[in-house]
C-alpha cells in the first residue's frame, strides 16, 4: 500500500493511506479550492469533488404556533376558521410573538402554507361551551394537494354533557404530513356542532383554539 506521509518539524508524522481492501476502480478526490469556516466538515458530492459544508445542528428546524382570537356562537352548522385577522401568533407571556423557530408558517384566509418541504406534525386544539344542554361537536384538520380541493385528514368527535351551566369541553387532534410542494400543499381547520347553540371560545390572551406546527424532518 502507498502512503502520503507528512512530517512535522518536530519529527513526528501524519500519513494518509489507501483503503484496507482493493477499491473496485481507481478513485480521485478533488480538494476544495478554499478553506471552510469554523465548525464545517468536508463532504463529497458522490463523484469525488470535496467541499466544506455546515453540519445539521440537530433538533427541530421549525416550530410555530397560531391561535384563533375570536369567540363565536353557532347552531347546527360548520365553520371554517378562515378570517385572516382572527389568527395570531401568541403574544402573551413567553409566547413566540413574531419569532417562530426558523421560517414559520404563513396564513391567509385561515389557509396555512408551509415554508419548505419536509415532514410536519400538526396539532389542533379547541375549547367550546354550551348552556343548559348537551350536544355533539366535531373538529377537523383539512388538507389539499392541489391548492383547491380539501379533504378531512384528522377529526375529533365529542359530546358536551349537560352537567352544569355552562358545560365545557376541549378537543385535541394531530396529523403528520409530508409536504413535497409548498405551492399546492396546504392545510386549514374546521369546527362543527349539531343541534343547539355552541360557543367556540377563541381568545386573544390564551390558547383556547390553537394550532401548532413542528417540522420534524426533511425529505
Give the positions of each predicted feature.
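Extracellular jelly-roll beta-sandwich "head" domains, especially the C-terminal globular C1q domain
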Residues: 57-219
Amino acid at each position: 500500500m502507498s502512503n502520503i506521509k507528512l512530517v512535522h518539524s518536530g519529527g513526528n508524522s501524519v500519513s494518509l493511506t489507501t483503503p484496507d481492501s482493493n477499491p473496485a476502480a481507481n478513485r480521485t478526490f478533488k480538494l476544495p479550492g478554499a478553506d471552510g469556516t469554523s465548525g464545517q466538515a468536508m463532504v463529497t458530492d458522490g463523484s469525488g469533488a470535496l467541499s466544506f459544508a455546515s453540519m445539521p445542528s440537530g433538533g427541530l428546524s421549525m416550530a410555530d404556533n397560531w391561535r384563533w382570537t375570536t369567540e363565536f356562537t353557532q347552531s347546527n352548522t360548520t365553520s371554517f376558521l378562515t378570517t385572516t385577522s382572527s389568527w395570531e401568533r401568541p403574544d402573551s407571556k413567553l409566547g413566540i410573538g413574531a419569532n417562530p423557530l426558523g421560517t414559520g408558517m404563513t396564513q391567509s384566509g385561515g389557509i396555512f402554507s408551509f415554508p419548505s418541504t419536509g415532514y410536519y406534525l400538526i396539532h389542533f386544539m379547541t375549547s367550546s361551551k354550551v348552556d343548559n344542554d348537551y350536544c355533539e361537536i366535531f373538529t377537523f384538520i383539512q388538507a389539499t394537494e392541489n391548492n383547491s380541493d380539501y379533504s378531512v385528514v384528522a377529526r375529533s368527535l365529542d359530546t358536551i354533557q349537560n352537567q352544569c351551566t355552562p358545560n365545557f369541553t376541549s378537543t385535541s387532534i394531530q396529523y403528520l404530513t409530508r409536504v413535497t410542494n409548498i405551492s399546492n400543499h396546504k392545510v386549514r381547520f374546521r369546527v362543527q356542532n349539531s343541534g343547539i347553540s355552541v360557543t367556540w371560545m377563541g381568545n386573544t390572551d390564551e390558547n383556547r383554539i390553537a394550532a401548532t406546527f413542528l417540522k420534524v424532518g426533511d425529505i
